Amino acid sequence: MTEQAEDTMPIRFTDAAAAKVKTLLEEEQNDALKLRVYVTGGGCSGFQYGFTFDEKVNEGDFTVEKQGVQLVVDPMSLQYLVGGEVDYTSGLEGSRFFVKNPNATTTCGCGASFSV
């Protein structure tokens, strides 16, 4: 990936999300891991978000680096996430990574699935 200004990125990676990934990688003692976000069919609204840690970047993957950690998105998922933001929250309901997706026309109550 070439360097781009953050406001021109197809997907943003917040400071909160990057900081949490950095903490988790330190706990795992594996700096090769990257946070991968993906979209699959399913959930109550048609599509759902998934998050996993991955050591590799595949050909065609889009990456964003912040605070020394990487967010990775495959090209198929990226088309549903353009203009979105991967964030992290911790509160009374628990802690989680989530996607703010301007392309989602509807989302389920928990925010884990969406339709376009």
Curated annotation (Swiss-Prot):
GO cellular component entries: cytosol
Pfam families (alphabetical): Fe-S_biosyn
SUPFAM superfamilies in the cross-refs: HesB-like domain (SSF89360)
Annotated signal peptide: none
UniProt-listed GO biological process terms: iron-sulfur cluster assembly
Cofactor binding summary note: Binds 1 iron-sulfur cluster per subunit.
Molecular function GO terms recorded: 2 iron, 2 sulfur cluster binding; 4 iron, 4 sulfur cluster binding; iron ion binding
InterPro entries linked to this entry: FeS_biogenesis (IPR000361), FeS_cluster_insertion (IPR016092), FeS_cluster_insertion_CS (IPR017870), FeS_cluster_insertion_RrpA (IPR023063), HesB-like_dom_sf (IPR035903)
Keyword Metal-binding among UniProt keywords: yes
Keywords: Iron, Iron-sulfur, Metal-binding
Residues binding iron-sulfur cluster, per UniProt: 44, 108, 110
Cofactor requirements of the protein: iron-sulfur cluster
Family designation: Belongs to the HesB/IscA family.
Subunit details: Homodimer.
Function: Required for insertion of 4Fe-4S clusters for at least IspG.
Name of the protein described by the UniProt record: Iron-sulfur cluster insertion protein ErpA
Organism: Shewanella loihica (strain ATCC BAA-1088 / PV-4)
Gene: erpA
